[in-house]
Amino acid sequence: MSTIPLRHSRRQWLPLFLLYLVSTLIILPAATLAADAGVKVSRFAHLPSKVSYFDDSSVVLYHDATAGVVYRSEDEGKTWSPVSGSSSGKAAMLVPHPYDKKQAFILSRELTHWRSTDRGKTWQEFLTPEPPATRAGPPMEFHADEKHWDWIIFTGKKCSMWTPWGGRICHDEAYYTTNAFATNPPRLLEFVMHCNWAKATPEMQTSTDALERIFCIAWEDAQEQRRSMVAGGTGGSTRLFQSDDFFKSRKMVELDMGRNARQFAGLGPSKRFLVTALRDSQGSSSKAGTEMALFVTKDGVKWEKAKFPHGSELRENAYTVVDSTSHSIMIDVVDSVYDNTGVLFTSDSTGTQFVESLRGTRRTPQGLVDFEHLVKIDGVGIANVQSEAEGGVRSMITFDDGSSWHTLKPPAEDDKGKRIDCDPSDAENCALHLWSVSGKTNVGKLFSSVAPGFVMGVGTIGKGLKNYDECDTFLSIDAGRTWKMVSRDAHKYEFGDQGSVLVMVDDEDVTDHVSYSTNFGKTWNKLSLGVTMRAKVLTTIPDSTSLKFLLVGSQTRKQAGGKDRNVVIFLDFAEMKKSKCRESDMEKWYVQAAAEGSCLMGHKQWYKRRKPDADCFIQDKFHDPEDKEDPCPCTDADYECDFGFVRDKQGECVATGNEHIPEGACAKPSDTYLGSSGYRKVPGNTCDAGKGIRKDEKTQKSCSGKNMPQKGSVLHKSFTFPSLVVDKMYFPESSSVLVQLADGTVFQSLNDGYSWKQLNGDGAPSSAEDRFLTMALHAYDPKRGYLITAGQRVYYTTNQGASWSWFSVPLPANGLGINILDFHPDRSDWLIWTGSRDCTFSTAKQCHAEAWYSVSNGAKWEKIDSYVRTCSWARDKKLKMDARAIFCESYQDKKGNQREFTAANRLELIRGDEFYRKRTRVFDAVVGFAVFEQYLVVAEYVTTSSAPGLQLHVSLNGRDFAPIHFPPGMQLGTRAYTVLDSVTDAIFLHFTTHSEAGSEWGTLLKSNSNGTFYTQSLDFVNRNDKGFVDFEKMMGLDGVAIVNVVSNPDDASVSRQKDLVTRITHNDGGRWKSLVPPSRDVYGQPYECNKVGCDLHLHGFTERDDPRDTYSSPSAVGLMMGVGNVGRKLAPYRDSDTFLTRDGGFSWEEVHKDAHKWEFGDQGSIIVLVNDEQATDSVLYSLNEGVTWESYTFGERMRISQIVTVPEDTHRRFILVGTPSGSATKSVAIYLDFSALESRKCVLNVAKPEADDFELWSPSEERAEQCLFGRQTYYYRRKRRADCYVGEKIVQPHSVSRNCSCTEADFECEFNHYRDAKGTCVLYPGVSPLSTDAASQCWAADSDGYWYERTNVRKIPYSWCTQGSRPDRGTRHVCSNNLRAHGFLWWFFVIGCAFGLAGLVGYWWAKKQSSRPGYGSSGRIRLPDASNRLYGRDSELVQNLASVPRFVLGAASAGFARFREIASDRIPFVRNRLDRSRGAYGGYRHLSTDEDAAMLPDFEEEEFER
């Protein structure tokens, strides 16, 4: 019975139990699904300067550089504690070992530092002889070989304290350790710039013999460097040294330049390569010595020079080694400094042959380039280019390592599924553009991570990139092929668990949550943080395999509520308790190129990746995803153009110049050689050529028809043009030449004239508007040229004619005699176009000129002004005006036919600032203006009571103008004038004094240094009826000029028959003298005229067919040639002979009878002559500067009009242009190649000059010492009988030995003075000398503390002479600013008062601070070493000083600079003191490189925004 109630009880509870069980089963999964990520907040006093994870571990370090403390977490940032040891308050730098996963270093600013070998758990103290140096790179360089990870190079900063006044000078010293600082490191090398191990990266295939090798950039002579640093200079040239025994012995790395391998600027690794940069003293361009050369090594033994396409200039601080691959180097070279754009080049697998990949890349002034490779994805990279679209920046993506580029395909819908109003097929107006490296707001890689295929970015859809706060956030899960918008507004983002978790946080405003997605961005959830903050950094472990993240942010005081304002939030998505993915949750994901399913870099790369909808986590922590590859057959897409080839319009790779023929090949035309096919496989491409096409295989080519002469012989080839040649244009430093024909066609040769092809726009000319009117070479950019048509289309090249494009202009070119194109000196894309409107018919009533400008190389135009005569950029190479200013000659009355305008319609000179938007009338009426070097000269039309006339003005800044003063009796009036030259800090001007037709001449005037006061240099200087003057400066030697003078002015004014004589100056017009004639002619016979007055006379500038022909050469220093005669006057041209000088015109010799045209080649080692009196079928050439001549016959007789070669005269190939006998309607070009006459390259050995092929030569005036312009300057020139060719451009001058003592040759007549018959400078009758300007002398940079009364002479502006005779100085007076002008008591009183006042102010400040509440409390900002110095760097006094407006400090700096100039010459100790207190590293330079490139990275610790 008792059991019945029990049974009944069970029956009652059973339903309840079942209900509970079912409820539990239902509730538990729901609870599991609802589980969210964990959030843990930690607070810190300051933001970190670095957050560093130990690879493949959960340990992370947080470096607070402000407090000098390093914190450590063992659980990926959940909990934190300061590291052990005594580094607290002293940690200035945290340096993880890049290869050893357990080592890290804490560096202080002093000598004591700390090392950990157990991921920061314990720290051991170690000492270094000097504190760390970060001037030229990181202070520690690590050996990359696993057996040598404890081998470290440490660079320290050594400073010397001296004098009671403080101050110091510093230099870098290198030390090394082979046991990770277990013992004190010994010194490696003193006075270094930077050192690297030969095994600098794990990828480098360093030879076994070079594993212990160290490379250092250092000064060859440490003592010389020490002396130069004390003197305030940069010292001797840096060189690259190597050592295999820690510099117990060392060897200079000569590369292939011998002892010219100097002035190294950088050294650093890039994946498989070690790269060094130095100044290229043996380049083939005219900029040799100013450009940089790159050398590359893969094994630490053999260095090879990197070769770039023609016209690519590597200037110091103007290139960046960017995020390269393991199989090639990518370098971005500055293309436009002011527009911050570059050209991206990619190398072959050797790292030496570079081809252009992308033009117009966006870069910052600091050298950061908007380019990044996607992590773990072969061949895919994203770059930004500058454009004229809205926003100005467009994003491009490559899927073949830069061989081709495409725009990013935008999504069709926004994050809410709403259709975006944009047509993706219109890539020009509808593309995705992303913020890149230059706008980086997070740490680590910008776009991608190890998570395969995942790419995120912040950007906009449209024509171009918008401001960051106008952007949205986008995601791609297929390596950039397609994109989707995942959120409005800009966000920071991070990837976790190989892409299973995506996290992003608002990057525009404060936020209290993050968003995350576990299904590849399909849906997003919010995770509350529990605090409101401004996100600074979002990061996770480097391999993105963890489910834990760190979010660093900062709060306002109100948000923090009195707590520390910087928060580190630990986000733990492992707490979501998702299951571990199984094999069925994974899929094979292929990296696809732009075309669906296609191969990428010659293979199909794939990863195992979680399926997008799989509800699991991979949870394979610390294990990077491994890629697999399926090989593909080679296709056209797997090849790119080889070095020296570019793609034409049909997409084929064609040679850009002379094709390289192997040395020794082509001994005769019937031979063959193996040459490039024009293609090479894209570096890193692994396609199977056996199963596809092979385009990179060397091909057998015939020597027949190749421009390769047989050894010891000359090669020629003729080409007949269909019309007469009327103009030519040779691109500097190239083999590209253009000729324009009379029929309006243009022909081009890319191989110095060996072969020619006609240039057409889009096929054959179809109308008269397609005729070419003229050619224009960019005045400042040697790579650019323009072909102007009769219509509104202009063809242009940016690569010296290798390829051509076109742009449209708003109006046809003007036919009003006005310059059509004007070029900006600094910004190659900035153009001014002057066209004509309504000028089609001669009877047009409103015909006028209009000027337009473009800042996009013709892509877009803006109107400047109408009815103008000239518009040009105000800025010039030496006239440093605002870059956007424009000068225009603009007519006052803007109506009517401009062709019929008279002086009644005034021509105003307008300066338009901000691209002519703000206009200022500079002069009411002008005749014209022109810029000459640093001088802007304006001819103003003035009307006086007597008669109208001209007044010249000059300006050095384009704003302030001063009238030009001529000698007495020389009033310009309406006389003609010609501004001739201004390269030697003075203007030469020809003032016409006799303008009768047939007997024109004038006076040659020369200005002072600011162009205002002119003195007579030479009278009766010849000119012609067009205003051209027989005046020519010698190229390569400053101050040497040749003129022709009318010797019979009285007779010539009546007979109009001028007798000309030649004069030369070697001191810039200070004195003129006759040309010393040779004693005998070319046959050794004496001249008929051999008495006093029998001089050498040469035909000058006014008689030349082509004004571009010159006496001298820019590269053959000291050489000049001319046609003339020995006698009492210049004989007719056909009665003249040919003469040569080797020493700048001091002595001459006759080299051939009869008049000849001439041209220099190979920097003067070859001279070519052709008869200029009659038709000829041969040329003469000399390989020994005219000692002997050889004749070469080229075939049919022709009347030669021109000898053409590259403008620098550095080639051994020439073009003869002429007309055949009996034909006056067609021109013929004869190609001549002399390169096989000499096979040995001249040797320049600085160490053993007696054993090389060059001699040092110094031009000399008529004085006891060898000086020119008061300076002894040495030039290299090939020995006259050396059997070799020069080759690369020699940097001239070689050296400046010293400044010479002043002599009479360094002075010229002062204003209002002239030279009388005795050569003495005398005052013009009835005038007064200029008054003395004492102030300008006393405040001049070279003032000696005195001012001097004027005399009858002045020092030639360009003379460098010092001391010696100074006839320009009269009575001496002490300057008022001279310290010697005051006595000892005066200076004692002034200095004492200053120190007393400073002491009172300091005492008052200290008392005030000590009485302030809270002074010295914990809230005060302290120095990193926690000191409490009142006048420390971060003291409140300094902070207040920092708030003073900059112009006040600028004024103080200017005053101090002025004081230094005075005091350094007055007080003995002040000179050295002021020179030495120039900061710790005055005189050193930084090499601008990419942050992500290993080559000299900026090793500042400011990785995070503060």
From Swiss-Prot:
Residues bearing carbohydrate: N1010, N1299
Protein name: Vacuolar protein sorting/targeting protein 10
Gene: VPS10
Membrane topology (UniProt): Single-pass type I membrane protein
Any matching Pfam family: Sortilin_C
CDD domains hit by this protein: Sialidase_non-viral
Predominant place of localization: Golgi
Lumenal side: 35-1383
Bilayer-crossing regions: 1384-1404
Matching PANTHER family: SORTILIN RELATED, SORTILIN-RELATED RECEPTOR
Presence of the UniProt keyword Protein biosynthesis in the record: no
Annotated localization: Golgi apparatus, trans-Golgi network membrane; Prevacuolar compartment membrane
Organism of derivation: Mycosarcoma maydis
